[in-house]
Structures are given as structure tokens and as C-alpha cells.
Amino acid sequence: MNRDLAALTDTEPQETSAPARLAPRLVAEAVGTGLLVTAVIGSGIAAQRLSPGDTGLQLLENALATGAALTVLIVVLQPVSAAFNPVVTLLERLTRTLSTGQALATIAAQLAGGAAGAVLANLMFSEPAITVATTDRTGPGLWLGEVVATAGLVLTITALTRSGRTQHIGWAVGVYITAAYWFTSSTSFANPAVTIARMLSDTFAGINPASVPAFLACQIIGGALGYLTARTLYPQP
């Protein structure tokens, strides 16, 4: 979801983005992922407090805030780097848009930013900085939901990229995630960095650490399916 996503095509890693250009990428990924997690967790806490006892309304509030925040973050940071998602970064490595070192550094920045975003959200709402989530999210239906959610996300990004319409990625991804909150059983985590960060807040958006490994596996599977589908639809980038 960034300028390198000329990206998710089959080009060699750009050596010109070594140290000097890697630093802005890492900052953008850390800040973007962090603020995304803050939006997810923070809006979940706000929804619980503002609409107690109405889970449907809470989810609507959480979905709208997350989708809006994600759209803005992509639009603002896309000229630098706006993946905010290790699945997308892994695809950039597989398609040789990034080198192995660049991809690993980017994922590390996403994970660190996500953790910081969880702490920030907790503190803003006067919660302890870190509380281990206790919400179990497990079972075949939820796992299938995560495969579908991530496949749709990657299909959206890759199809727009391979068809030369990257200017639409910001709003398309934001709208997709807002919708996927509702049409997937898992409420569309669709992002390993965000999933891991959500372990750190025992609030509306939290996920029990025991539920995380299966979610991560489903996200990787979904990412692969979404990418292969997009390549089939758009064989010539």
C-alpha cells in the first residue's frame, strides 16, 4: 500500500531505498500501524463506554472509526510507506519489491508501532498501560472468517496495484475493512501486527493470546489466496 507497490508486481528490490530511504519507511510503518491500533482499541473502549449493553452499536462505532482512520493513514503516508500489515510486507518480499532485510525491518517497525499504539489507547482511556486480553476468539467459523477477511483485503490492494489504480487504495481499503467488520465472523482482524497488539488490551477489541496463532495462520493463508486471485484476474501488471 505504498509507492513501492508498483509493488506486488515482479520487480527487483530497489537498492536506492537502502539506509537513507529505509529510515522514513520504518518511521511511516511504525507510526501508521501504531495509530491504526490506537484507533481500533481506542474506539472499542469508547464504544463500550458510550453504548453500554448494545454490542451491535459498539461494533458499528468501532468499525466506522477504524475504517475512517485507516483511510486517512493510507492517504497521508502512502507516498512514503503505508502497508501497516506484515502480510502485505511479506508479499512485497515475495514479489521482490523489498529485500529480505528491508522486509524484516519493516515488519519489526509494524510490530513495535502496534504495541505502542495499544499502550497509547489504554492510557488515553485511563486503563493500565498493558492488560492481557481474555476474549477468546476461536473455532472453525472464526478461522474461516479471518481467511476471507485477509483474502479480500489483499485482493483489493493487489488488484488495484496491478491494474494501475493505486490512487484508490486508501478509500477502497478503508471501506472494505469497515464492511468486513460486519460480514466476517471474526470481525476482520486481517493483520498480524494489529492482532498481536490487540493482545495487550483486555477491552472490546482484545484477543486472548491463545487465540492468536490460529488467527495469524489464517491471515497468511488468506493473504496468499487473495494475491493469487488478483494475479489471475490481472495477469499483466
Q: Predicted regions: what is each one?
A:
Residues 1-237:
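Membrane-interface helix-loop junctions and terminal tails of multi-pass membrane proteins
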